[in-house]
Amino acid sequence: RQVSLPSSWSELWAAAWSAWIPGGDGYAGGADPLTILMAILSAPFAPMGITPGAFATFLLVASTPIAAMVAWIPSRVLASSLRVRFLVSLAWSLAPSLLMSATHGVLAATLAHAALPIFVAYCVGQPKPLLVAGAGGIDEAPLRPRGINGGCAALALVVLACCAPWILPLGAGVLAWRSRRSLLVALPALVLLVPTYVSIAARPSAWPALASTSGGVHAYTRADSWMAMLGMPAAPSTPLEAAALGIIGAGGIAAAGIALLRLRTRCAAFAFCGALVAAATGWAAAQIGVGISGAFVAHAWTAPALSLSFGALLVLAARSGSGNEDEVEASRPAWDGSRPFTVRALGALSALVLLGAGGGVAASAFAARGDAADTPTFTLAQRSTVSPMSSPIVSAVASQAQRSTRAGRILVLDGDPTTGTVNAFLWRGSGPSLTDGSPATRALALAQARSGAAEGVLRDPATASLAQAAYTLVVYPDDATVATLAAHDIDTILVPLGASGSQALTSGLDRASGLEKVGDTNSGTVWRVRPGGVTPSRVRVESASGVTTPVGGSQLSVSGDVDASGTLILAERADSGWRASVDGTALAATEAADGWSQAFEMPTAGHLTLTYSAWWIIPWRIASGVCLVVAAASALSAWRKR
């Protein structure tokens, strides 16, 4: 399923370059790499009024033509024949890994698939001269076709690394094998992802995050080993989808196998074995848990590894000519010369088979979404594949609170308290958001959940506080529990339509004082959290007499006049990076009574400034900006006139 993006580009941009992750009760660290990438890619469209969410949806829907168009230019490295290049681009755009990633809404995998041919073409080398038919026979054209320069390769590697962080070490190894100077191509991606790699490497519990794509996790049915060898990262949902994807994957293996028998070279054998190893590695990595999706363990989505495998098979098939490479060069026809009828017929048949299989996958996807209009939105959101939603997953009341200066959050409850199971999710956006976490935080959340299940104790104070309050609220509700929820800046509580145990959950919430029932909406049943009539806020000032004053701000900072004094409390995890000042005078941090939130002593009223800062954030921003600008300038130089 596709995660949501902020409604405005400015909010996405701020989250991308922040040292604080605005998800749940907040985390210290760099943003998800896909957040950074989407902030950059969507920047040109922001002045047109195109939201990041609409742009991401377009990238998913148009992933097949985008992959075909991007692969067309790099395909010149493999062959000069337009027919061969067309077949290679068509096959690449209909690869099983890409089609399933688009169906499951995994944006990172689709972008990685599109960028991979550019980087591979740079590593393979410059294209050979075109052969033209002259008066004296077949001769080389005086000018070589343009290849992929270092700037284009650097930007492609940035996309690949942001989508699948494990690709950067692999890509750096390939660049080092090509030449030491080529390692400069990996510098922009390395600088951009330094916070991600440091956050993962610093905690062994986060190491599994390297196995998956960035941009969120989702629970899905893993593919069998033979399906992975055919390029499928997940089990097909219908027999039609299985047959169509199987035809494409098996066709790629068959074409590469025939090419291997014809070429009989070490490079061909290495490419074929490398493709099998990449597919096997992808299947093995899919067994690794990398996060939590609802009440389930989410395993690594390894489509980029299967794309690498499929790409190696296509390279081998496209480069096949005859048994000896020297003979191929000697007997190559002109680039636009006529081919034998058998070859042309085989190419046309291959194109028809690919298009038919792609149509089968599309038909299967549309058939699976046929019941979307009659299915509750929350149930659709729990599916592993994407579906159109007839109503928003968040009610208008909750959405308004989120967009207000209080930055209210939503507590979503699922499960059955009669069996001792309550699932609680804290949302800052319209469902799980791209800015909610990072690969490291998701892997750590899974590790903490497993540790808590084994030991019976949650070691993170914020998580323990929310879990205890959510369960108590529906079983033995009291005023203190509602106040605890307000301390987490929970403005509304949602029991979605289609949630399991909704009747028992609703019964418990109706008994709780301090909750105002809004009623039944298209999203589900909604309550406002109002302990003692106080409106929750992300930032508040509590006076010594017990008066609470909400303070307006954004998800990441506060700047404004506050007519109150006492203890300044943030509904964010305590961290030494938080800085607060009143009229330019720094406030002293203090320990909050709840044991998890950030607090400051605020003796006087005045103009409050509250930000989060880390020592590394400014140097990282500057270095990233310089590297990206240099790479973009180098890429644009490829289009200068000769």
Describe the role of every protein-language-model region.
Residues 367, 371, 402-483, 575, ...:
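Extracytoplasmic/lumenal acceptor-recognition loop(s) of multi-pass membrane glycoenzymes
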Residues 534-642:
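Active-site-proximal, structured, solvent-exposed surfaces of multi-pass membrane proteins
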Residues 61-64, 294-329:
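Hydrophobic/aromatic-rich transmembrane helices and adjacent perimembrane loops
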Residues 190, 324-365:
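Signature aromatic-anchored transmembrane alpha helix within multi-pass, membrane-resident enzymes
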Residues 1-67, 108, 447, 451:
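Membrane-interface coil-to-helix junctions
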Residues 182-183, 256-288:
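Membrane-interface helix-loop-helix junctions at transmembrane boundaries of multi-pass membrane enzymes
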Residues 64-73, 77, 83-178, 182-197, ...:
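Membrane-embedded helix bundles of polyisoprenyl
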Residues 18-28, 32-33, 186-266, 380, ...:
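Periplasmic/ER-lumenal interhelical loops and adjacent helix-loop junctions
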